[in-house]
């Protein structure tokens, strides 16, 4: 696609008064500095923006409003910003329907008519009559209260659902009579990082922490998770503590009742990797039996059959395996393979009385169906090369559902018959997008240490490799999370306007199992950044794009990725989008759930060596005066209680204070929003319109054609 070019220097000069020190630098809102230092192993580290950690303080609120105005004033000058927003609204406006699930005498599914702030949960009876069951759009005036989870009892007569207000991780649990939809008068408050698991009709298990003191709810550290049982008809203050707290201090604890209602399973962990597993036989009223203790591996109960327990684990199997044991002696030495480890990472789902094994080869899914003895029933033929998710359901169900997607295929839901192996389209979205006009190719490139890395590159057919294609390079690189092909209407608009969307599967993720993850953690974390840098260099060397047309993008741990990359290699790209990022690596573990991320990062208190390593790449601590950084939009939310906004506030302030060239440094702060989940459609569209228009504008593009 052709673009008209614009001198961004002229636009930037016209936009704001210039600094007396450097006529190329924008005049940013004033951010005060304080005299504060911390000492680590004898080394003093200055923290001049420490005051921004108090996100409820009046001076912080005033600073936020100044930055919001500055950012919006800058974005308002982009001539095609509204045009891109209209394009996004237009393509977003299609009916989205989830896979159905059965509970009691009803079939439930969620649907969004197109531009609704939140999807609505519907149900259909045996006669085919459909009605609204839960409409989150009525939870709040602005559509920013979302449905976080829904859990029915076994008979489908009772339901407990949790809601998140403003994207917060602190939820409420509301209980309904599913038949009448009448709300029970016993709402549970201050619930965090919790499932909801029913025990018959008596009540349910849930998890939470002691809530931080008033004024630090969004930033205070949460520790010592607790599992409670709420008995219907009683007050929350009467809920029974099952496990956790001072007598069993663990950072994360989850409890659930198995499908046969016989066992209570408890998973406990101190970090995001590695867990202990305990099980209680409710039928025989045993105490908790330890299946595995310590945090050296991951294990969970995949299914049960009488006394037999099926466990899914990476113990002695970095790519994971399915094993079986018995309740009488579930220790690891008794485990027997049902589905053995292979060279590809494995995930397991159960439904229809079968196991469905999803193998990931170079970030692409392959699915196989096995019986309970581990005998292969069939390899399932998928509609193409991409990501298949689903295949879960009750043991008695013969029809299961799965969703298939890739970067140029909108997610389509298929109904799968476990007996015949036939798949048929259940729901295909009517998106204004023709996959036939686009290409999604996988390439492999070499990182700085010789490691081979896969990357998916998607774009519109007819693209010329002349180095002038606007390109978003996006990745994550952490916490064993795999980036698999998935369609996005935002990326569709980007590609429709001539852009390239590239996703490298860098180390730190789970694309090649535990070893791949571990190769991007702690003292090897820089492998992640080097992999990302090498991806950008590959795209530039092979003519897909050039520095002047490349944008770096990532969120959360991916925000760290972008922040570290742009401070290590400020010359790599024209634009950078560190979104809701972990950016102060010396203090991340002091806030909310941050201490649980230490498996990936290590902490500044671990050792002198670990402190020095973290400091050497921590984005907040590596912004250097006199350096020209990319045009940057630091993205955060003022109510983010997962990765607190202080990370972004500090990093953005450092960049604004030390930027040495005309490239703008914006801090886009979403007000009354959290880490990302549960935002309204309007909020998501607005952010992405800002992101895409800023990228193109900073690449020197004047208008779209």
Curated annotation (Swiss-Prot):
For this protein, the parts annotated as crossing the membrane are: none
A molecular function (GO) term: serine-type endopeptidase activity
Under catalytic activity, the entry for this protein gives: Hydrolysis of Pro-|-Xaa >> Ala-|-Xaa in oligopeptides
Active site per database record: 556, 675
Q: Where, per UniProt, does this protein localize?
A: Periplasm
Q: Which GO terms describe its cellular component?
A: cytosol; periplasmic space
What family does the Swiss-Prot or TrEMBL record give for this protein?
Belongs to the peptidase S9A family.
The record's function comment reads: Cleaves peptide bonds on the C-terminal side of prolyl residues within peptides that are up to approximately 30 amino acids long. Has an absolute requirement for an X-Pro bond in the trans configuration immediately preceding the Pro-Y scissible bond.
User: What is this protein's name?
Assistant: Prolyl endopeptidase
Q: Which organism is it from?
A: Elizabethkingia meningoseptica
Species classification: Bacteria, Pseudomonadati, Bacteroidota, Flavobacteriia, Flavobacteriales
């Amino acid at each position: 696609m052709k673009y008209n070019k614009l001198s961004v220097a002229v636009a930037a000069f016209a936009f704001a008064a210039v600094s007396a020190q450097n006529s190329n630098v924008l005049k940013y809102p004033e951010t005060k500095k304080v005299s504060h230092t911390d000492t680590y192993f004898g080394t003093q580290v200055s923290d001049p923006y420490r005051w921004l950690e108090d996100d409820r303080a009046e001076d912080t609120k005033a600073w936020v409003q100044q930055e919001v105005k500055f950012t919006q004033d800058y974005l308002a000058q982009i001539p095609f910003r509204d045009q891109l927003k209209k394009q996004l609204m237009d393509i977003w406006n299609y009916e989205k329907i989830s896979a159905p699930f059965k509970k009691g005498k009803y079939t439930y599914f969620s649907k969004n008519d197109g531009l609704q702030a939140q999807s609505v949960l519907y149900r259909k009876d045996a006669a085919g009559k459909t009605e609204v069951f839960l409409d989150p759009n009525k939870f709040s005036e602005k559509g920013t209260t979302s449905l976080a989870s829904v859990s029915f009892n076994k008979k489908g007569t009772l339901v407990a659902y949790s809601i998140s207000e403003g994207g917060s991780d602190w939820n409420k649990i509301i209980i309904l009579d599913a038949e009448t939809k009448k709300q029970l008068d016993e709402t549970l408050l201050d619930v965090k990082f919790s499932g909801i698991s029913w025990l018959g009709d008596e009540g349910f298990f849930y998890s939470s922490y002691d809530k931080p003191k008033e004024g630090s709810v969004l930033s205070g550290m949460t520790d010592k998770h607790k599992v409670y049982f709420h008995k219907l008809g009683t007050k929350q203050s009467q809920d029974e503590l099952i496990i956790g707290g001072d007598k069993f201090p663990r950072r994360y604890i989850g409890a659930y009742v198995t499908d046969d209602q016989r066992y209570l399973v408890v998973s406990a962990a101190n970090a995001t990797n590695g867990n202990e597993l305990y099980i209680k036989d409710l039928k025989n009223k045993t105490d908790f039996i330890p299946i595995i203790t310590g945090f050296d591996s991951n294990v969970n109960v995949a299914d049960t059959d009488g006394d037999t327990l099926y466990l899914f684990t990476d113990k002695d199997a970095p790519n994971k395996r399915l094993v079986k044991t018995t309740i009488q002696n579930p220790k690891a030495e008794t485990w027997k393979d049902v589905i053995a480890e292979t060279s590809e990472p494995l995930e397991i789902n159960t439904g229809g009385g079968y196991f469905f094994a999803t193998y990931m080869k170079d970030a692409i899914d392959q699915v196989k169906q096995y019986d309970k003895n581990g005998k292969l029933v069939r390899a399932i033929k998928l509609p193409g090369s991409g990501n298949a998710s689903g295949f879960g359901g009750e043991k008695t169900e013969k029809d299961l559902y799965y969703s298939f997607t890739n970067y140029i295929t909108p997610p389509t839901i298929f109904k799968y018959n476990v007996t015949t192996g036939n798949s048929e389209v259940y729901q295909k979205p009517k998106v204004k997008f023709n996959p036939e006009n686009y290409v999604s190719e996988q390439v492999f490139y070499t990182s700085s240490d010789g490691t081979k890395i896969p990357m998916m590159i998607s774009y519109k057919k007819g693209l010329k490799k002349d180095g002038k294609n606007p390109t978003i390079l996006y990745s994550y690189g952490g916490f064993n999370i795999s980036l698999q092909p998935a369609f996005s209407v935002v990326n569709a608009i980007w590609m429709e306007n001539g852009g390239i969307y590239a996703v490298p599967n860098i180390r730190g993720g789970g694309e090649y199992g535990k070893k791949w993850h571990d190769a991007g953690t702690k003292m090897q974390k820089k492998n992640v950044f080097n992999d990302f840098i090498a991806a950008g260099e590959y795209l530039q060397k092979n003519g897909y794009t050039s520095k002047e047309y490349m944008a770096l993008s990532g969120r959360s741990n991916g925000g760290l990725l972008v922040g570290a990359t742009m401070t290590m290699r400020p010359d790599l790209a024209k634009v950078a989008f560190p979104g809701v990022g972990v950016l102060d690596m010396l203090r991340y573990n002091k806030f909310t759930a941050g201490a649980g991320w230490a498996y990936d990062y290590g902490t500044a208190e671990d050792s002198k060596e670990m402190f020095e390593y973290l400091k050497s790449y921590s984005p907040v601590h590596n912004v250097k005066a006199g350096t020209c950084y990319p045009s940057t939009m630091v993205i955060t939310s003022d109510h983010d209680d997962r990765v607190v906004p202080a990370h972004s506030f500090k990093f953005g302030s450092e960049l604004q204070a030390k930027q040495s060239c005309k490239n703008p440094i914006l801090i886009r702060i979403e007000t009354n929003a959290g880490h990302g989940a549960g935002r309204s459609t309007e909020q998501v569209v607005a952010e992405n319109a800002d992101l895409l228009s800023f990228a193109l504008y900073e690449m020197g593009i004047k208008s779209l054609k």
